[in-house]
Amino acid sequence: MRTPDAHVIASMEDQPILNAAFNQDSACFAICHNRGFRVYVTDPMDLRVQREFDDGGIGVIQMLHRTNYLAVVGGGSNPKFPQNKLVIWDDLKSKPALSLEFLSPVLNVLLSRTKIVVVLQNKVHVYAFSSPPSRISTTDTADNPHGIAAFSGDTVVFPSRTPGQIQVVDLSQEGQARNLVSIIRAHKSPVRCVTLSADGSVVASCSDNGTLVRLHSTSNTALLHEFRRGLDRAVVYNMAFSPSGSRLAVLSDKNTMHVFDTSASASGAAGAANRRHVLGKVPLLPSYFSGEWSFVSARVQGQHGVLGWSSETSVVVVWISEARWEKYVIVEKKPVEGSGKDQPGCELVREAWRAFKDL
């Protein structure tokens, strides 16, 4: 679809972003607001679809790859659809293709070509993507007001009924036939954020303490890595694996984005690029001196954003609170003469940014 010329695109100053989500490979992302939604190519940022409604806003949105189908839920000051109703929107026909209604608000939606995952505050429903949708399963969860869940490949993860634990469900044909469900005892306090690698083999999670990020295998629940984001309590808003799964970006309310090297095996040495505290090997010191720290980080000017990788070295942030797109790249530092051989090898720098209102 042709991108409208810049001078005819309406300003978003009077329609702040309500939510944003990358598609399954982060090649595109969608934002929703008080009058509709937009779809962009991620990098370079390019507007592809703009839909505005006269009768209300969209509060939750999820793309299905690059198809004409999007999952939407009403939101904002005047929701277009009831907030307990999930609509599969056919943008080619500009009308709903499917809908599902629930007894409580829909907080999150995850899609594949064959499944629809609907997240409520205390339940997760899985449906076959068919007309009409047929329900595959319903699972009770711990209180989940942020709609925390992740879906990749045939694997879906979400908080279990016990705070701090993560439920892993295999949605493959074999997994459904054998009812393959695993529980990961990930944290002592409630889970605040989860994400999956592209193949669904690794889940990254953090609790509402926001100090540690743990990586577990979804096949056997083994702990693969423990990363330290920081020492102070923080709210981790979003995490995302790079396309190969060898790096993990973490965004928190501390105005910092961290990137961890996840390439080392659990049985081997820690990721070569990650740092360790200088006191990490001193006996009898608190555990927060141990563990791996990010190998690059950057100060960011934003609070609530979502992450997507456009390449192995490029991370894009869509800031919901600031209505801004930013691109950060991992680059090699230039050697400083006379500084010795052990200079840091990489840094995370902001390469580009654009405000949505300026399009």
Curated annotation (Swiss-Prot):
Q: What GO biological process terms are annotated to this protein in UniProt? A: autophagy of mitochondrion; glycophagy; nucleophagy; pexophagy; protein localization to phagophore assembly site; protein transport
> Where's it found, cell-wise?
Vacuole membrane; Cytoplasmic vesicle membrane
Single GO molecular function: protein-macromolecule adaptor activity
Q: Report the domain remarks.
A: May contain a beta-propeller domain involved in specific binding to phosphatidylinositol 3,5-bisphosphate (PIP2), leading to the association of the protein to the membrane.
GO CC: one term?
cytoplasmic vesicle membrane
What topology does it adopt in the membrane?
Peripheral membrane protein
WD repeats mapped onto the chain = 186-225, 231-270
Q: SUPFAM superfamilies this protein is in?
A: WD40 repeat-like
Q: Which family does it belong to?
A: Belongs to the WD repeat PROPPIN family.
Gene transcribed to yield this protein? HSV2
For this protein, the record's InterPro entries field holds: PROPPIN (IPR048720), WD40/YVTN_repeat-like_dom_sf (IPR015943), WD40_repeat_dom_sf (IPR036322), WD40_rpt (IPR001680)
What is the first-listed, main subcellular location in coarse terms?
A: membrane
What's this chain's function?
Answer: Involved in mitochondrial or peroxisomal functions and amino acid signaling pathways.
Q: Which residues form a coiled coil?
A: none
Keywords linked to the UniProt accession: Cytoplasmic vesicle, Membrane, Protein transport, Repeat, Transport, Vacuole, WD repeat
Family annotation (PROSITE patterns): WD_REPEATS_REGION (PS50294)
Q: Which domain of life is it from?
A: Eukaryota
Any idea what this protein is called? SVP1-like protein 2
